[in-house]
């Protein structure tokens, strides 16, 4: 079953770019990644083919990269959910 997380942290997009440089560019199982600024900092929405693939990426790649760049505490998802439907109507890229 597809799985999604929504995380918000009081960090900058530049900091997230530093983390991105340390993890695989196209991790196995990632379907969709949305990242943007919020009033608090940065929010990230990720959709995965399965919770197992999300958990594996977090444990093997993202948690170590976050610990290296951000330190503790590592931001925990605000929300995680089993996904019943994913619809992408066209590819959108924003710099």
Question: Can you say where each PLM-predicted feature lies in the sequence?
Answer:
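Short S/T/G/P-rich N-terminal loop/turn motif that feeds into the first structured element of a domain
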Residues: 1-45, 49-63, 70-95
């Amino acid at each position: 079953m597809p799985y999604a997380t929504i995380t918000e942290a009081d960090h900058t997009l530049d900091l997230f770019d530093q983390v991105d440089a340390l993890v695989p560019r196209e991790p196995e199982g990632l379907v969709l990644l949305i990242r943007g600024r919020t009033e608090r900092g940065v929010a990230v929405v990720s959709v995965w083919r399965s919770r197992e693939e999300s958990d594996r990426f977090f444990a093997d790649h993202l948690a170590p990269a976050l610990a290296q760049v951000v330190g503790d505490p590592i931001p925990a998802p605000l929300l995680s959910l089993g996904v019943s439907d994913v619809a992408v109507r066209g590819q959108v890229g924003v710099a």
